[in-house]
């Protein structure tokens, strides 16, 4: 009886019992409803192979795909006061920060990476929407400025990947202060004669579009990205009119001269490397694909 209880029954249970499946093993395509295996999606830089839909991507994954051989070094996040306003809504702001830090492993919504693309050294500043919607607060603002200062120090071009819902309401006026501060950092980079390329990803809205996200020398948008100051629903409720189809999409903005080109994430590295070589007068690789045609 002991043999049956201790050996046979566990064997049967292991054969017939339900196996635990890891979370997010399959990802649903928001545009078609298709289920995509997570590993297939990751190997394609989180772009749905069949539809081309660009899923949101974490900052460290983006840096890994962007830099040569996935190798880069990150700058230590600057220290700022955590909750100077002692803000509370449904929960304390400081508790919310701790929760996001625990879930994401990040200090705030910005990661600065140093590395090369096709051998060209650059600084990349990446905004991560998974950390409080990529919102711009003191920590994120200080990290953005840190990236610009490092680019100036090393005399490197800076590529910024914007993804944000706007200013961080829990920090009030201290959040809004980051708009002029980051704008000054952009001007410092340009005065140093260094190239500034902005990649607008889904979504890029709110205060970031009123500051550093729209001040680049070249603006590239990922396909299907929502880009604008206020969201379309807010605008429709304000003006009481229906907006044009595709309004505030990256394709709409390129057609109307607000961005220079729309480029798939799969082609971003080659496109940006080619632009860097042209703009910095480096020898171009004739095998690299030409950048997509820019908007008028």
From Swiss-Prot:
Location within or outside the cell: Cytoplasm
The CoA carboxyltransferase N-terminal domain, residue ranges: 25-294
Main location group: cytoplasm
Keyword line: ATP-binding, Cytoplasm, Fatty acid biosynthesis, Fatty acid metabolism, Lipid biosynthesis, Lipid metabolism, Nucleotide-binding, Transferase
An annotated Gene Ontology molecular function: ATP binding
Superkingdom field: Bacteria
Pfam families: Carboxyl_trans
Gene Ontology biological-process annotations: fatty acid biosynthetic process; malonyl-CoA biosynthetic process
Recorded catalytic activity of this chain's protein: N(6)-carboxybiotinyl-L-lysyl-[protein] + acetyl-CoA = N(6)-biotinyl-L-lysyl-[protein] + malonyl-CoA
GO cellular component, one term: acetate CoA-transferase complex
EC number(s) on file: 2.1.3.15
This protein's pathway: Lipid metabolism; malonyl-CoA biosynthesis; malonyl-CoA from acetyl-CoA: step 1/1
Keyword Lipid metabolism: yes
Family statement drawn from the similarity comment of this UniProt entry: Belongs to the AccD/PCCB family.
Quaternary structure and partners: Acetyl-CoA carboxylase is a heterohexamer composed of biotin carboxyl carrier protein (AccB), biotin carboxylase (AccC) and two subunits each of ACCase subunit alpha (AccA) and ACCase subunit beta (AccD).
Function: Component of the acetyl coenzyme A carboxylase (ACC) complex. Biotin carboxylase (BC) catalyzes the carboxylation of biotin on its carrier protein (BCCP) and then the CO(2) group is transferred by the transcarboxylase to acetyl-CoA to form malonyl-CoA.
Name of the protein: Acetyl-coenzyme A carboxylase carboxyl transferase subunit beta
Gene: accD
């Amino acid at each position: 009886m002991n043999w049956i209880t201790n050996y046979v029954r566990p064997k049967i249970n292991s054969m017939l019992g339900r196996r635990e499946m890891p979370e997010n093993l399959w990802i649903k395509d928001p545009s078609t409803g298709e289920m995509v295996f997570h590993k297939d999606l990751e190997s394609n830089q989180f772009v749905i192979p069949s539809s081309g839909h660009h899923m949101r991507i974490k900052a460290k994954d983006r840096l890994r795909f962007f830099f040569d051989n996935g190798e880069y070094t990150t700058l230590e996040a600057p220290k700022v006061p955590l909750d100077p306003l002692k803000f509370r809504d449904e929960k304390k702001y400081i508790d919310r920060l701790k929760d996001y830090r625990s879930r994401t492993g990040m200090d705030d919504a910005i990661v600065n990476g140093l590395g090369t693309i096709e051998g060209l050294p650059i600084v990349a500043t990446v905004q991560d929407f998974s950390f409080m919607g990529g919102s711009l607060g003191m920590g994120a603002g200080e990290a953005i400025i840190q990236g610009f200062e490092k680019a100036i120090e090393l005399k490197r071009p800076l590529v910024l990947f914007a993804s944000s819902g706007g200013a961080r309401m829990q920090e009030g006026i201290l959040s809004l202060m980051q708009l002029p501060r980051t704008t000054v950092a952009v001007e410092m980079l340009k005065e140093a004669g260094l190239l500034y390329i902005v990649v607008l990803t889904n979504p890029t809205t709110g205060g970031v579009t009123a500051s550093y996200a729209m001040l680049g020398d070249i603006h590239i948008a990922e396909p299907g990205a929502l880009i604008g100051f206020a969201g379309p629903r807010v605008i429709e409720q304000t003006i009481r009119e229906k907006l044009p189809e595709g309004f505030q999409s990256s394709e709409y903005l390129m057609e109307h001269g607000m961005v220079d080109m729309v480029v798939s994430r799969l082609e971003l590295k080659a496109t940006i490397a080619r632009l860097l070589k042209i703009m910095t007068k480096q020898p171009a690789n004739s095998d690299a694909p030409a950048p997509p045609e820019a908007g008028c």
